[in-house]
């Protein structure tokens, strides 16, 4: 019944502060619970309708497969074969892109995609973007080598990267990937 991505500590620039948001959500839940439940159910129903329509459309199946192949090919063209990932500096982890490639590789194994994934995952976990002492990934690397981190860690990045490394561990059976997952989750729990 309520969503957002960032709330400043105090009211600022027309945005409510985090404390005000929490108090408003608490008030709505306590005093307008039926309305909250109704809105929540409406949102869930709408999402389910969209997903059913989106994923049950079997027409143009070849076109959808072609789009996936084209997306994979374009991503591989942009790949940094020396240091992993795409582009140069600053270099951001792209867990959703790597997850897409991982799934593509699961269903249609290709040596080039396999190599790109391993290069990227290994470079990130061995670089300075990964906090070797406390676990968790920094937001991005200020250089193209994944060595110099921008010293900020985001929960959503670490959640996506934990999922990515878990799926990569299941596919490639590299013990280091499972260790990264555990360290990320420990970091998130402790911080």
Feature map (PLM): residue ranges:
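Replace the tail clause
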Residues: 1-191
């Amino acid at each position: 019944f309520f969503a957002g991505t960032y709330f400043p500590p105090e009211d600022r620039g027309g945005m409510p502060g985090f404390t005000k948001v929490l108090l408003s959500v608490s008030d709505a839940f306590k005093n307008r619970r039926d309305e909250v439940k109704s809105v929540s159910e409406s949102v869930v129903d709408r999402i389910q309708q969209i997903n059913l329509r989106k994923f049950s459309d079997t027409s143009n199946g070849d076109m959808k497969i072609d789009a996936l192949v084209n997306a994979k090919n374009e991503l591989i063209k942009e790949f940094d074969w020396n240091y992993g990932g795409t582009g140069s500096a600053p270099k951001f982890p792209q867990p959703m892109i790597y997850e897409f490639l991982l799934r593509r590789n699961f269903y249609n194994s290709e040596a080039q995609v396999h190599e790109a994934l391993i290069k990227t995952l290994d470079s990130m976990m061995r670089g300075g973007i990964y906090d070797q002492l406390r676990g968790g990934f920094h937001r991005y690397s200020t250089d193209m080598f994944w060595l110099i981190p921008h010293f900020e860690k985001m929960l959503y990045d670490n959640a996506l990267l934990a999922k990515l490394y878990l799926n990569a561990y299941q596919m490639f059976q590299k013990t280091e990937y499972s260790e990264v997952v555990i360290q990320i989750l420990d970091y998130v729990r402790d911080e």
